[in-house]
Amino acid sequence: MTITKKLSRTEMAQRVAADIQEGAYVNLGIGAPTLVANYLGDKEVFLHSENGLLGMGPSPAPGEEDDDLINAGKQHVTLLTGGAFFHHADSFSMMRGGHLDIAVLGAFQVSVKGDLANWHTGAEGSIPAVGGAMDLATGARQVFVMMDHLTKTGESKLVPECTYPLTGIACVSRIYTDLAVLEVTPEGLKVVEICADIDFDELQKLSGVPLIK
């Protein structure tokens, strides 16, 4: 099967941003999820970073970076009017205490039940570093996953059961891939939108679990 059109990382970030509601408190995980900050437009959304920052704006313009203003992924960020800095422990209290509406995280695998594996593949010699992902997965009211649909070797990242170490159990609400948007339901993964030049049957063949129309 040849896919000639699928979402880029930027387009995936735009699609996630479209589903973030006005007034939401949101944590953007390290990596591709941080791109979402650039596509929120005029919506009033409060972006949180686990290193102790609330009220982040989009990425700074080239040449306007402030080395004292970075997110948890060590990327330069901007601060909106009214933004605040606070202790790392206070930041994790926000994460664990259910004060964040949405966490947008990357993933290696998501199971049909919404289990999340995003911090370690079990590869020999690799250094596991879960960071705050477990706190976000269990503490945020909703978890949006942003990931490629397939691995580099063509295997589905949607799986019946996660084979990598878990970050959270039944914590994922929505999955945004370069091919589709899926909702985690008690019955399974429901296709909300197909974002590539394939139909439902072709998407099903590429997915490691049964999908619901």
UniProtKB/Swiss-Prot annotation:
Keywords assigned by UniProt, alphabetized: Aromatic hydrocarbons catabolism, Transferase
Enzyme Commission number, as recorded: 2.8.3.6
SUPFAM superfamilies listed in its UniProt record: NagB/RpiA/CoA transferase-like (SSF100950)
Quaternary organization: Heterodimer.
Protein species of origin: Pseudomonas putida (strain ATCC 47054 / DSM 6125 / CFBP 8728 / NCIMB 11950 / KT2440)
Name this protein carries in UniProt: 3-oxoadipate CoA-transferase subunit B
Enzyme class: transferase
Catalytic activity: 3-oxoadipate + succinyl-CoA = 3-oxoadipyl-CoA + succinate
One MF annotation (Gene Ontology) recorded for this entry: 3-oxoadipate CoA-transferase activity
Pathway: Aromatic compound metabolism; beta-ketoadipate pathway; acetyl-CoA and succinyl-CoA from 3-oxoadipate: step 1/2
